[in-house]
Design a protein with these regions (language model features):
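Pyridoxal 5′-phosphate
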Residues: 1-416
């Protein structure tokens, strides 16, 4: 087949063949997919599982029929609700049970972790971030510097991702903490987490990872990679709904370290004595000791359902399907790029990226709008000129990829 034919009927037929042949079947039937839409924006907000509505309704029913007694009774009592996700959230990020917890939101968790793991000294005042970090992380890091009476302009080191490991080898003795994004939100590039983590530790620094675009997207081994801490959201690839409760990882070697400052809150207190309300804070061992307030159960229900599905399918299987889906889309975008004015800026090697492919076009917002209004293809865009397409392996299909590339070709040809 000539590559140019991939954008026509022959490509649609090939997409159907690839779907039938994939040994990791789609779970599309378990999701509410907007009618007629090729939805490739799961890197922004994942789709809703059908099971979510029932899970939320169960909480509402328990509240209406049991009231306060639902804390200890019902199918999923509220007091230990977060514990029902202890193993599934750990499995999502490659942690040991107890090293990961569902709580707060990503930036709140980042502030919490910086309060514990950014402890500057006169010799080690610096904190390293990457140049193209999502702004919320930059704001949190700058705030952490100010909280210690330091000038962010003097202690926050902003580097290109490719320069971080070398900088740590050369100047790491002045670095207290490193905070990086595992997957770049604009380009979709995946950093070498274990190598950079090792470089940070060689330098004597602690390192934390923002997994917003990595959790549920690529397999993670946070415990084995010796990561100090990590934070993430559950509303992108994990599909737990807008503003979903986030996640936090603390390596077990820090879990009982009394020298590490924790925020302190009653839900992080040992549950055996929590309701005795003692004067002194006695934290739960592990990441759960960083909890502050009791969990929002209505918001936790979609997270529980979503994590259960990931545990059922398995990240390795999902990653295998994801590599094939994104590879097919990549091949199609190459055809578009050969005849239209677009440029793929995501690394081409599968081990350097997740599901997302990012392309540069003129007037990205207008192109994104045209893709949806004319062809019912949902992508998203980020300034100044980037369109992001992310086939989510749980519910996207090869046909979705073909529709996206074919529509992009027509939009860029101005024949629509």
């Amino acid at each position: 087949m000539d590559d140019a034919e991939l954008l026509g009927a022959a490509g649609a037929a090939l997409a159907a063949e690839l779907e039938d042949a994939d040994d990791v079947p789609t779970r599309r039937e378990q999701f509410v997919v907007p009618e007629g839409v090729a939805y490739l924006a799961g890197n922004s907000l994942g789709l809703q599982q059908h099971a979510v509505r029932a899970a939320v309704d169960d909480v509402l029913e328990a509240w209406s029929t049991l009231g306060v007694d639902a804390h200890e009774h019902g199918a999923f009592p509220w007091l230990p609700y977060h514990e029902t996700m202890r193993e599934t959230v750990a499995g999502l990020v490659g942690a040991k049970p107890g090293e990961a917890v569902v709580m707060n939101s990503l930036t709140v968790n980042l502030h919490t972790m910086l309060g514990s793991f950014y402890r500057p000294t006169p010799d080690r005042p610096r904190i390293v971030i990457e140049a193209d970090v999502f702004p919320s992380d930059r704001y949190a890091v700058m705030g952490a510097a100010r909280a210690h009476g330091l000038d962010p302009a003097e202690v926050v080191v902003v580097l290109r991702a490719d320069d971080i490991a070398r900088f740590l080898d050369l100047e790491g003795a002045s670095v207290a903490t490193v905070v990086l994004s595992a997957v770049d939100f604009r380009t979709g590039a995946l950093l070498d987490i274990p190598a950079i983590t090792e470089a940070a530790h060689r330098a004597g620094a602690r390192i934390g990872w923002d997994l917003a675009h990595a959790a549920g997207n690529v397999p993670l081994r946070l415990h084995d990679w010796d990561v100090d801490f990590a934070v993430w959201c559950h509303y992108k690839y994990v599909n737990a709904g807008p503003g979903a409760v986030g996640g936090c990882f603390v390596h077990e070697r820090h879990g009982n370290d009394a020298s590490i400052v924790r925020p302190g809150g009653w839900w992080g207190h040992d549950p055996v004595s929590r309701f005795a309300m003692p004067f002194a804070f006695d934290p739960v061992p592990g990441a759960e000791g960083w909890q502050v307030s009791n969990p929002p159960i209505l918001a936790m229900a979609p997270v529980r359902v979503s994590l259960d599905l990931f545990a059922e399918v398995g990240m390795e299987a999902l990653r295998a399907r994801s590599v094939r889906l994104t590879g097919f889309l990549d091949r199609l975008l190459d055809v578009v790029a050969s005849r239209r004015k677009i440029e793929v800026i995501t690394p081409r090697a599968p081990d350097r990226r997740g599901a997302q492919l990012s392309i540069v076009v003129d007037d990205a917002r207008a192109v994104t709008d045209a893709l949806f209004e004319r062809f019912r293809v949902r992508a998203d865009d980020r300034p100044p000129n980037v369109i992001r397409l992310a086939p989510a392996p749980l519910y996207n299909t090869y046909e979705d990829c073909w529709r996206a590339a074919s529509a992009l070709d027509m939009v860029q040809s101005s024949t629509w």
